[in-house]
Amino acid sequence: MNTNHIRQVVIVGGTHGNERIGLYLVKKFNQDSSLLFRPNLTTNCLIGNPQACKENQRYIETDLNRCFIKADLDNHLLGRHEEKQAKVLHEQLGPKGNSENFLLDLHSTTANMGLTLILVNDHPFNLHLAAYLTHHNPQVRVYRWTQENQENAFVSSLCQLGFAIEVGPIPQGILLASLFKETETLIHQTLDYLEQVNRGASPPLPKTLTLFQHLEVVDYPKTSNGELAGMIHPQLQGRDYQPLNPGDPIFLTFEDQTLFYEGCSTVWPIFINEAAYYEKGIAMCLTHKQDISLK
Ligand SMILES: [Zn+2]
């Protein structure tokens, strides 16, 4: 793949129909294509799941952002709404793993994630761009959601280049002007970098990048019937990206009993109390904070 010249940038909003910031940014950009114009860059915007956006629902039948496993994309027996929509997007933006596009997938979260880039691979191009963005925008954090021997199923996994942008906290189904504008700025900073690459320039970069590497997901306490038995502990609520040490409070049961983190080392939880993850059995994702040096 030629990383000295980005063929096309694709910005996807509304992959989840109740995440309105990405949807309305894409609508805005599509109304006036001059907004994203860079002389050496071609940028297109599209809505990931138009039907779900119309209904202001995360999805119609299943989570679109878990439908991009290669075998599933090739399996024409899978005919639920999002499984079909994934094949449409794959046709437009793929083929998965070999696409020359740079993909930005816009999301929002009810968790206190600030501005997060979610990387789904280790491509040096993405790490360099992430370092550039954290340097120019110190609010930006970088989360790498890779798991050994496990294929990623996100929209953003269609292309080697690019990532998802996850912003929060924001309730589902609404807009917040502050996060809307911060996301828009981040998109412009990304395009500025890509424009420099296409002009043949090498934007100056910091030598290291701080990233939060995915470790594992943690479920809520449950009864033997699988019913919720507790909530995020008030001392943990909203503390995404803050260190959680062994013995720190993590959940509060409905009987007012505090449950403590029983791991053996410090972790950095994120996606704490994300509304869409209750059905997935995810109360938070644990990460390890690390500094990596850039080559
Ligand atoms: Zn989302």
UniProtKB/Swiss-Prot annotation:
<dbReference type="GO" id="GO:0005829">
    <property type="term" value="C:cytosol"/>
</dbReference>
<feature type="binding site">
    <location>
        <position position="19"/>
    </location>
    <ligand>
        <name>Zn(2+)</name>
    </ligand>
</feature>
<keyword id="KW-0862">Zinc</keyword>
<feature type="binding site">
    <location>
        <position position="58"/>
    </location>
    <ligand>
        <name>substrate</name>
    </ligand>
</feature>
<dbReference type="Pfam" id="PF04952">
    <property type="entry name" value="AstE_AspA_hybrid"/>
</dbReference>
<feature type="binding site">
    <location>
        <position position="107"/>
    </location>
    <ligand>
        <name>Zn(2+)</name>
    </ligand>
</feature>
<dbReference type="GO" id="GO:0016788">
    <property type="term" value="F:hydrolase activity, acting on ester bonds"/>
</dbReference>
<feature type="binding site">
    <location>
        <position position="277"/>
    </location>
    <ligand>
        <name>substrate</name>
    </ligand>
</feature>
<dbReference type="InterPro" id="IPR050178">
    <property type="entry name" value="AspA/AstE_fam"/>
</dbReference>
<keyword id="KW-0378">Hydrolase</keyword>
<feature type="binding site">
    <location>
        <begin position="65"/>
        <end position="66"/>
    </location>
    <ligand>
        <name>substrate</name>
    </ligand>
</feature>
<feature type="binding site">
    <location>
        <position position="16"/>
    </location>
    <ligand>
        <name>Zn(2+)</name>
    </ligand>
</feature>
<dbReference type="GO" id="GO:0019807">
    <property type="term" value="F:aspartoacylase activity"/>
</dbReference>
<dbReference type="InterPro" id="IPR055438">
    <property type="entry name" value="AstE_AspA_cat"/>
</dbReference>
<protein>
    <recommendedName>
        <fullName>Probable aspartoacylase</fullName>
        <ecNumber>3.5.1.15</ecNumber>
    </recommendedName>
</protein>
<dbReference type="Pfam" id="PF24827">
    <property type="entry name" value="AstE_AspA_cat"/>
</dbReference>
<dbReference type="GO" id="GO:0008270">
    <property type="term" value="F:zinc ion binding"/>
</dbReference>
<dbReference type="InterPro" id="IPR016708">
    <property type="entry name" value="Aspartoacylase"/>
</dbReference>
<comment type="similarity">
    <text>Belongs to the AspA/AstE family. Aspartoacylase subfamily.</text>
</comment>
<keyword id="KW-0479">Metal-binding</keyword>
<dbReference type="InterPro" id="IPR007036">
    <property type="entry name" value="Aste_AspA_hybrid_dom"/>
</dbReference>
<feature type="binding site">
    <location>
        <position position="166"/>
    </location>
    <ligand>
        <name>substrate</name>
    </ligand>
</feature>
